[in-house]
Amino acid sequence: DTQTENVIDFFDPLPSSSYAVFDSGYKYMFDRFNNEFRYIPLNGDIAGLMARTSINQFSWFSPAGASRGAINGAVKLAFNPSQSQRDLLYPKRINPVVFQPGSGIILFGDKTGLGVQSAFDRINVRRLFLTVEATIERAARAQLFEFNDVITRSNFLNIVEPFLRDVKAKRGITDFVVVCDETNNTPDIIDSNPVSYTHLTLP
């Protein structure tokens, strides 16, 4: 149908990226500043769902569905995809926003704009790793200009490992390994003074 094809045709040329999120359209809402109803793009709402999920739960929870994906202030949708339309949109990286009786208007997809199959084609996985990477970066920055010795490496591990245990306890990851010892800090690396670590996380 024309609506589905128009949405797919718009997003198809856009580059593949796990840092982007595509949705299916516009909501009809009241514009109190101009005292009239108008159609507004949903991308601001999708960003708001992610912020609300981070505040009320954690960044690694999906912002979609009846529990966390409710679109506020929407009277109706310009395009309310049916099941068959959703089946066409979702493989094309487009997250449908739909009206569901009993739930209202909700985000009904969790895809990033990544064009290949990967763990990072899910919004919650990408946001999990953004959170983990930022914390590890801060921990590493705190060790700048310190000696590459057991004490410095222990300080780094004492920041990172409890954080990852907490993420695991809160259902963000299933397991993790952090290696920061003599196996990946060889004498050559120690002589040149950077601290090397290996981090493996299973979402």
Model-derived regions: residue spans:
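Structured, hydrophobic secondary-structure cores that serve as assembly/anchoring elements
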Residues: D1-L200
